[in-house]
């Protein structure tokens, strides 16, 4: 089975269709793209955002204060908080244009956002963190919710 390629100048609609087809095809072959999508998400995070986040963490007295500073700096969706010892990240809307371009985007697409959070918090805390997708807008939920753990 051939997955194909996409032109580097493809429109966002063509990109969305390609990604969705890729995820659906690989999933049907029992190949799951979780790691690949998470790496892609990590690439979407700017080095400047990481630098700012590290500075905010350095001047914070605790995780709750750090998350409030990230919210004020508009890093991470503006809705980060602690619940039951985990960092909870909530998006009230989908920030990515790709899934909006096609109907029935493969739910694995949101591993991209999980990768974004994974890179952000792993870089700031200088250790690997665990990111769990609780639910997403692509999944039909009213908001995206991610849990970040293993950061302490």
Features from the language model and the residues they span:
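N-terminal accessory segment detector
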Residues: 1-108, 130, 151-152
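Coil-to-beta-strand transition motifs
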Residues: 128, 139-143
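Active-site helix/loop of acyl-thioester processing domains in fatty-acid/polyketide metabolism
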Residues: 108-126
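C-terminal edge-of-domain segments
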Residues: 143-152
């Amino acid at each position: 089975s051939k997955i194909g390629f996409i032109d580097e100048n493809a429109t966002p609609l063509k990109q969305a269709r390609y990604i969705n087809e890729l995820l659906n095809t690989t999933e049907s072959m029992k190949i799951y793209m979780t790691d690949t999508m998470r790496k892609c998400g990590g690439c979407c995070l700017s080095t400047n955002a990481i630098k700012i986040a590290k500075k905010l963490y350095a001047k914070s007295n605790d995780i709750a204060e750090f998350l409030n500073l990230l919210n004020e700096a508009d890093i991470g969706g503006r809705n980060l908080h602690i619940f039951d010892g985990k960092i909870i990240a909530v998006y009230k809307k989908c920030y990515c244009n790709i899934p909006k371009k096609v109907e029935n985007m493969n739910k694995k697409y949101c591993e991209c956002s999980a990768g974004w959070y994974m890179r952000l918090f792993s870089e700031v805390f200088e250790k690997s963190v665990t990111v769990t997708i609780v639910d997403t807008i692509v999944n039909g939920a009213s908001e995206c919710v991610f849990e970040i753990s293993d950061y302490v």
